[in-house]
Amino acid sequence: MIRVMATGVFDILHLGHIHYLKESKKLGDELVVVVARDSTARNNGKIPIFDENSRLALISELKVVDRAILGHEGDMMKTVIEVKPDIITLGYDQKFDEAELQSKINKLGITVKIVRISKYDGQLNSSSSVRKKIMELIGERY
């Protein structure tokens, strides 16, 4: 069985997230989605609207997702060790250096393939584009 691990904040769920998860699932038999902790999101400059447990609950309900978990605070490698993925997928906009990530994982003695998933071409394909649209709509109303 090929286990795929997809990670993200998944705040304001949108079609870009669905694309990322569906494309990730196509690469294996089991999709494990790791939802970033609130503290991790904040440390990366993002302020989630939904708290980590709400985001985990939303992701868990998606039929493409086999299992959803919260990531470890401060150490992604602990999550990699726990999940034992064959493949880790990255979103088009995730700020990971693939070679550096591969090196860190190799040092743990784990063999993992890293795959960057393409951008969803539709409108409102990122949380920031959804937030921008909301601000435009609010500005028009008030």
UniProtKB/Swiss-Prot annotation:
One of its GO terms (molecular function) is FMN adenylyltransferase activity. It holds the Pfam family CTP_transf_like. Pathway: Cofactor biosynthesis; FAD biosynthesis; FAD from FMN: step 1/1. Signal peptide: none annotated. Its EC number is 2.7.7.2. ATP binds at V9, F10, H14, L15, G16, H17, D93, Y120. It is an enzyme of class 2 (transferase). GO terms for biological process: FAD biosynthetic process; FMN metabolic process. Keywords: ATP-binding, FAD, Flavoprotein, FMN, Nucleotide-binding, Nucleotidyltransferase, Transferase. The keyword Nucleotide-binding applies. Homodimer. This is FAD synthase. It comes from Thermoplasma volcanium (strain ATCC 51530 / DSM 4299 / JCM 9571 / NBRC 15438 / GSS1). The lineage of its organism: Archaea, Methanobacteriati, Thermoplasmatota, Thermoplasmata, Thermoplasmatales. The gene is ribL.
